[in-house]
Amino acid sequence: TLHMEERVGFVGVVNEDLSQAARVNQVVGQFQDMVTGRIGVPDHERGMAVIGLLVRGDSARVGAFTGRLGNIPGVQVKSALAKSNTTSNERKQDI
């Protein structure tokens, strides 16, 4: 089978419907083994929240995670992953 490379990155979540917060937290909990850091900033005045997640996992699994979050009404998701998991020392050795 094809081995998927583990990568690091972030997932940004904008929840414009705080009534969906429990669903967002449920999905994050289902993928908690990938989440290495989390910050959540609620804005009760506007009825929204922004969540930043640091993640580590293969691109297919991160895609499944962001897809599940993005399917929640009122939730927008963007993500970025490092192109590879090689360290700067490993890259220097290749030169």
Give each language-model segment a name:
Residues L2-I95:
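Long, contiguous binding/interaction regions
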